[in-house]
Amino acid sequence: MPITSTTPEPGIVAVTVDYPPVNAIPSKAWFDLADAVTAAGANSDTRAVILRAEGRGFNAGVDIKEMQRTEGFTALIDANRGCFAAFRAVYECAVPVIAAVNGFCVGGGIGLVGNSDVIVASEDATFGLPEVERGALGAATHLSRLVPQHLMRRLFFTAATVDAATLQHFGSVHEVVSRDQLDEAALRVARDIAAKDTRVIRAAKEALNFIDVQRVNASYRMEQGFTFELNLAGVADEHRDAFVKKS
């Protein structure tokens, strides 16, 4: 199954994404991912969740080819709702979520990582939003949780990427390790959290979300509204068609 949940150690659930070749996730799978993360947190035996991926990179965002081969706006609407559901599931998961990022993390991957509680990354990890090159907007909400405001704006306007070391400098990435040590690095954090009283940790997760100065769900939905405007204007289709022709 492309979205799987395993228990590498008692109290720790690893949710794995595996959509080769680049983990560009089709619409339905975003909902599957949301369900997997929510179910993990809802289980009283779970003390921490690790979000990880197999393959070349952590996440390449939505499946643009799926959108372009589907008539009308159905695939676009499903992808937007699916991303919203998955990002929200990570943010509202009842226990802390540790993102283990390997390789590229772009588009929707930023939404997942930005809403995670702790991030560990491989040395080759890169982060960015190519949205403006796809005729879309979105996940600036989450990128702004990873880097300062002006850097976020430059990255968004230019579709540039930053490496894991840069995010570690800003404190958003906890640890940078070799790719073969990534799973163990995520497990170390998960073990530290799992060793605490889960009743307190669950209360802390809820409390930290309540005092968050950024209303991430509403903010992201606002961004999606501009994406729909670009689609209605025909701008987004032009950029997605160009992307599909190049790929």
Swiss-Prot record:
Gene3D superfamilies: 2-enoyl-CoA Hydratase, Chain A, domain 1. The keyword Lyase applies. Pathway: Steroid metabolism; cholesterol degradation. It catalyses: (7aS)-7a-methyl-1,5-dioxo-2,3,5,6,7,7a-hexahydro-1H-indene-carboxyl-CoA + H2O = (3E)-2-(2-carboxylatoethyl)-3-methyl-6-oxocyclohex-1-ene-1-carboxyl-CoA + H(+). Its EC number is 4.1.99.-. GO terms for molecular function: lyase activity. CDD domains: crotonase-like. GO terms for biological process: cholesterol catabolic process; fatty acid beta-oxidation. InterPro entries: ClpP/crotonase-like_dom_sf (IPR029045), Enoyl-CoA_hydra/iso (IPR001753). SUPFAM superfamilies: ClpP/crotonase (SSF52096). Keywords: Cholesterol metabolism, Lipid metabolism, Lyase, Steroid metabolism, Sterol metabolism. The keyword Lyase applies. It comes from the Bacteria. Pfam families: ECH_1 (PF00378). Involved in the final steps of cholesterol and steroid degradation. Catalyzes the hydrolytic ring D opening of (7aS)-7a-methyl-1,5-dioxo-2,3,5,6,7,7a-hexahydro-1H-indene-carboxyl-CoA (HIEC-CoA) to (3E)-2-(2-carboxylatoethyl)-3-methyl-6-oxocyclohex-1-ene-1-carboxyl-CoA (COCHEA-CoA). Belongs to the enoyl-CoA hydratase/isomerase family. This is (7aS)-7a-methyl-1,5-dioxo-2,3,5,6,7,7a-hexahydro-1H-indene-carboxyl-CoA hydrolase. The gene is echA20.
